[in-house]
């Protein structure tokens, strides 16, 4: 009897529970998102929101970490938020492997590639949809596509600027993966002069 009970329990646990799968209300399936111009506009707005976040140009790549690394201002240890002061001090002293600066640098790297992945999804799908799905026809479709390409180029350039040496140092060295497609593969690494 115990054997049957164990086997029955195993069968119940091993079966699929599709009725438990709930799609969150604040998410949308990729196939649904990229079927209308409205979906493409929403996806592009999501890219702009992420670019404007504190992790990128909302702080770290504008007045925050990057300004401290460029020594555009002096740090005052009497300020509130000692952790942010330590990050600024280490960045100004070019100490990029400290416990305060490493998480910021890693966040910049990961967030930029995450945004590039989202942009690549837009580029991947935009040619598969007819211009009639866009409120302003082909002009809007071309505008969204052009913005996506421009944003991807800007983000790759900033990654190169931040994480690769100057071209005069080693023009043929490869330092960063260049991502043109969405997916788990690393991507081709280009030289700084490519």
Residue spans of the language-model regions?
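Membrane-proximal, proline-rich intrinsically disordered regions
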Residues: 17-68
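A structural signal for short, hydrophobic/glycine-enriched beta-strand patches
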Residues: 65-102, 183
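Secretory-pathway/luminal and periplasmic proteins that interact with or process carbohydrate-rich
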Residues: 52-58, 76, 155-165
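Conserved, well-structured interaction surfaces
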Residues: 84-163, 190-193
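Short coil/linker segments at helix-helix boundaries
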Residues: 137-141, 163-194
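Generic structural "secondary-structure junction" signal
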Residues: 22-24, 30, 35-36, 96-98, ...
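Short, surface-exposed recognition loops and adjoining beta-strand edges that mediate ligand/DNA contacts
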Residues: 30-31, 58-81, 165-172, 176
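Bacterial Sec-dependent N-terminal signal peptides
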Residues: 1-26
């Amino acid at each position: 009897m115990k054997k049957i009970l164990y086997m029955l329990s195993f069968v119940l646990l091993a079966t699929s529970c599709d009725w438990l799968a709930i799609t969150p209300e604040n998410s949308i399936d990729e196939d649904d998102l990229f079927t209308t111009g409205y979906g493409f506009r929403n996806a592009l707005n999501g890219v702009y929101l992420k670019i404007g976040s504190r992790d990128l140009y909302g702080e770290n790549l504008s007045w925050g970490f990057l300004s401290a690394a460029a020594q555009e201002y002096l740090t005052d240890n009497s300020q509130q938020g000692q952790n942010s002061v330590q990050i600024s001090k280490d960045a100004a002293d070019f100490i990029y492997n400290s416990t305060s600066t490493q998480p910021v640098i890693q966040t910049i790297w990961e967030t930029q590639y995450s945004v590039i992945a989202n942009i690549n999804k837009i580029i991947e799908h935009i040619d598969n949809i007819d211009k009639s799905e866009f409120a302003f026809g082909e002009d809007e479709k071309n505008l969204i596509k052009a913005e996506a390409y421009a944003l991807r180029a800007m983000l790759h350039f900033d990654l190169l600027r931040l994480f690769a040496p100057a071209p005069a140092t080693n023009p043929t060295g490869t330092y960063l993966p260049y991502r043109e497609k969405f997916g788990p593969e690393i991507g081709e690494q280009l030289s700084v002069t490519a």
